[in-house]
Amino acid sequence: MSEDYLDRDVSPALTVGEADIDVSLRPRSLREFIGQPRVREQLQLVIEGAKNRGATPDHILLSGPPGLGKTSLAMIIAAELGSSLRMTSGPALERAGDLAVMLSNLVEHDVLFIDEIHRIARPAEEMLYLAMEDFRVDVIVGKGPGATSIPLEVAPFTLVGATTRSGALTGPLRDRFGFTAHMDFYEPTELEGVLARAAGILGIELGVEAGAEIARRSRGTPRIANRLLRRVRDFAEVRADGVITRDVAKAALAVYDVDELGLDRLDRAVLSALTRSFGGGPVGVSTLAVAVGEEATTVEEVCEPFLVRAGMVARTPRGRVATAQAWTYLCMTPPVGVTGLSQPGLFES
C-alpha cells in the first residue's frame, strides 16, 4: 500500500505521529462511547453477566472497517471488567513461541487484545485454539523424533480479536469466539457527538453547524472526523479567530481538498478515470489503479469501499462500473443504459 494513502486526511488508518492524540480522545467507558448502540448494549450484558458470576467473559470478536473504535472497545472491556489489558497484533505473532510467551504472562481475568487477528501466522493460530478452549498450550521441546510436547496451563483470560476482514478468519478460529459483533459506519448525527466530545477535550470552540459540516464529510468514521477537526482547528487558529464556524470549516476543508461528500483527490481521480478513460466501465481494479498511478490494493481497500457505499461505484463480475450518481457527481451525462444504483448511497436506507 502506498505511503500517499497513509497521508490522506480521509484515511481511516492511524497516521504517523497520530497515536498519542488518538489515545487521548478515546472514551474510557461504554457510557462515554458514542455510536454503535446495539454493540454497546450487547457488550454491557456480556460484561455485567460475567461480573455477576465472577467468571471470565466469553472470547469476543469485533469486526468492521478501520477507524470505528474496535481498539477503544477492547480498552473499555478491560476497564469495565477491572482487568489488565495486554495488546498485540496478528502480524506480530509470527511464531507459536511469540504467542506462548504472551500467554504465559497472563494472570486470571486478563484481557488479551489481538488487532488484525486475521493476519496471525498459522502456527500461532493453532496454539491459540487450545488456549482459547482449554486454557492451556502445548510447548514442543526438542526437534525431530526426540521432540516432546509439554502442556502448560494458561490463566483463564478473555481474548478480544479485532478484524477488518472477518471473512479472512479460518472457521476453527472464528468458532472459538463466544460473542461476535460487527461495527457499522456512523451516522452524521453520531459523528457530531464524537466531534463535540473531542472539541471539549482539545479545548476547541466548535459551533453546532460547523460540527455538522465536518461530520458529513467524515465518511462515517470517527477517526477521520477527529482528524478533520484538528485540520480545521489549525486553519481557524491561523486564518480566523480560532473559533470554528460553519464557514470556517468549509473554507478549511476546501484547503485540505475534502469535498462535501468526504471525497478527496484520489477518490475523484478514480471516478474520473472510470468515467472519462473507460466510459464508465466495467474495468478491472488493476487497470483502474494504473490509470490513477496507485497500487491496486490502495484502490481496492481504501477508495473502493467508500465509493461503493456512497453509491458511486458498483462491483460486477466483469469489473467496476460507475453508477449514474458518479456521473452526476462529476457533472457529466451518463451513457444511455446507465441506471441508478446497485446499492443504496451512503446513509440511505
Swiss-Prot record:
A single BP term in Gene Ontology: DNA repair
Span list, region Large ATPase domain (RuvB-L): 1-186
Gene3D superfamilies cross-referenced by the UniProt entry: 1.10.8.60, P-loop containing nucleotide triphosphate hydrolases, Winged helix-like DNA-binding domain superfamily/Winged helix DNA-binding domain
InterPro entries linked: AAA+_ATPase, AAA_lid_4, DNA_helicase_Holl-junc_RuvB, P-loop_NTPase, RuvB-like_N, RuvB_C, WH-like_DNA-bd_sf, WH_DNA-bd_sf
CDD domains in the cross-refs: AAA
Entry's Gene Ontology molecular function annotations: ATP binding; ATP hydrolysis activity; four-way junction DNA binding; four-way junction helicase activity
Domain notes: Has 3 domains, the large (RuvB-L) and small ATPase (RuvB-S) domains and the C-terminal head (RuvB-H) domain. The head domain binds DNA, while the ATPase domains jointly bind ATP, ADP or are empty depending on the state of the subunit in the translocation cycle. During a single DNA translocation step the structure of each domain remains the same, but their relative positions change.
Protein name: Holliday junction branch migration complex subunit RuvB
Organism from which the protein derives: Mycobacterium leprae (strain TN)
Gene that specifies this protein: ruvB
